[in-house]
Amino acid sequence: MTEGRSSAAAAASLWERDAEIATVTRTLDALRADQSSAGSLLVFRGEAGLGKTALLTETRRIAERRGCTVWSARGGETLKSVPFNVVRQLLQPALVSLLPEEAREYLGDWYDIAGPALGIVDPGEGSVDPQYVCDGLVAAVRRLARREWPLVLIIDDAHWADQETLRWLAAFAERLDDLSVLVVVARRPGEVSGESARHLEAIAAAAGRPVNNLSALTPEATAGLTRATVGRHADDPFCREVWAVTGGNPYDTVELLAKVLDSEVQPVESRAGELRALNRAARGGGLVDRLNGLGIDATQFAWAAAILGTGISVDLVARLASMSTDVAERCAELLRTARILTEPEPVAGTETEAGELEFVHPLIASAVYNSIPPAVCTAMHGVAAQILTETGHGAAEASRHLLKVHPDDDEELVEQLREAARDHLAVGAPDAARRCLERALEEPPRPEVHAHVLLELGHATLLTAPSVTIEHLQSALAMPGLDGGQRVDAVVRLSQALLHNDQLEEAVRTVEAEAARHGAGPVKLRLQAVQFMWEGIHGETVSQERSRALAELAGTCTGRDNSERALLILRGFDAMTHGENAEEVLQLCDRALVNGRLAPGLGWTDGEWGIELLMMLGSAYAYADRLDRAESLFAEALRAYTGAGWRGGHLSLANAFLGLAYRRQGRLRDAETTLREALSLAERVGRGLPLYWSSTCGLVDTLLARGHVEEAWSIAEQYGFAPPYPSTIVLPDIRSVRGRLLLAVGRTEEGINELEAAEKRGGGRARGKPGKPGGGGGGFARVPAGPVPPRPGIPRPCSSRRLPLS
């Protein structure tokens, strides 16, 4: 009976789907025709029960019949918080067939980045940039897809896919032009919001064709299905009522007709009035009543299965529901007969454990889960987390259950969630880490631990959401718990977040206030160095008094520790921006190095000082004409961030400043390539931030130097390279580059105004020795405009004019 109904359900869901099946068939034929052809993306959208899964099953059947390899995965309503869950499902056939050394060979340089997210490599310590992991997954799947041509990727219930998978899928969908693969996605309309919704919109846009919206069955199709199921003698009024009751929903229609058969209702007009009651019993509250009618044991078995969501087995459910194996086996059979649970269909290339079960339809799974009393639900999630932990699974795997447990001042749960957050960060899932730490705060943590959880929450969001980081770190510093070095680290990290959020004045005040709390010593010296560092890149706070104070403090430093080395770098940068002797600038910078290299603890990925100090060091070398050392520093930054998996703002700035070094060397083609990469990365982090301005300004400047005026103007228009400008120093100077651009396109008066504003702004800096190689009007500012071909009506800028770019 169950098998027959499953076949009927599948057949019903394909009624009136000829157009969709024809689209699938044509696309598959195109895929198989040419391995060099572009890839395709099909998106099917429809309400629950309209036959999306049946259509994807038919897609699999057609594809396999044509000799295609098919990988498939499915989102789950209770699994949305599990990072990379769906993409791991999707790639399981490929991953289980590869030995570790084969996987490393196929994934190449991306093995250590994508491997932890896919669960085939143990993650390292610390945080990994989620964008880099996403890029690694895109590269990994592209390599695997080329090996398996012709390949079809099927993702069902994408509205319930985890955010990390959706981010990968959106990025992957944008790169199908040179990859012969078919991607088929099915989802419900609505159901999601925030980042997940934006990713789904991007996926639909990447399809390059209208989304296939599935419609309900017409009255004629419903009548045909009714007669095919209950007999040709079903009369027209009865068939019409079936359609009216179900709205033409294929799933509801099949379930209702199954009830008609079970109840032995004759399909005639006189019995049509009974259909609405039968339909209510098939789903929602009626389904719950039907479940309760099977007995308390069967009900608890179904509840436990709904809590698990995936990997449902009789043994595991028995343990979760606290029942014997014999009772659990009997309950499983009852639920199979009642069409609540079923055995999953075997899929080529995947491993299915003996006795594994799944819900017949997601609607049933949702109804069962939502029927669990809240107190019972949270308790069962707690038991499920405990079972996973006891069976050797990590805190990250148990965290989806821990998130559902009712807050109860549980110190152990707080520690488990903190551990899960660390695991999530290590695979590039900061949003999952954030959810764990936010839930830990609700427990709540002990007073002496609370600030530490907030600090960890601030670290979890630093690379992706500076504004959120600021809120958490300010809260952590406002309560007891952070002492000594931890508090200083938190203050410095907060000031970095404020800087990246374009709140530089507040960043300076934050460090200044903390420095006032300490007496003379290494801690105070470090905070003073950080304060000078932020002031040094804040164009509005530069003054002669500040420079004198910095010179006096740096004059006492010999480079004995990193605080002294930082002050030497800051003094060298300040001297360069004020046009002091270039040789003195270089001597200061060289004294900050150890045997010509960055000191331990001052590396590009070391967290104590951050990226800004080393960018100042490299800039000082660049504008003091030690271009070899500047290039070496920025190239080292690129390698360090790439190796560490930091593909956000850090890598963008590394590219931007390496582009600056190339620009100063006259390697304009290399500069343009590097700066375009910097801008692409910066846009992912967010427009308007200082790193975004650095990339845009550098690229416009380089295009002008290459004589590509129209392209420079196009970039400026596209990326908002116009006032209002940020308060931070940007290299090269924004106003100077903008002024040259305006002159180049013939907007002479506006260009002159910008250049005069740049000169006025730079006047306070460019004092002292303007003729020296590092002078404010020279070394720091002397970036020749480059050859710009004369154009009618556009005055040619004077390439010999020295402009203040600081």
Report the location of each language-model feature.
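Conserved adenine-nucleotide phosphate-binding loops and their immediately adjacent elements
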Residues: 1-27, 112-125, 273-283
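P-loop NTPase Walker A phosphate-binding motif
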Residues: 47-81, 85-88
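Short secondary-structure boundary elements
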Residues: 50, 221-229, 233-435, 439-442
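Internal alpha-solenoid helical repeat scaffolds
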Residues: 64-66, 204, 243, 258-261, ...
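Sensor-1/coupling segment of RecA-like P-loop NTPase cores
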Residues: 168-207, 211-213
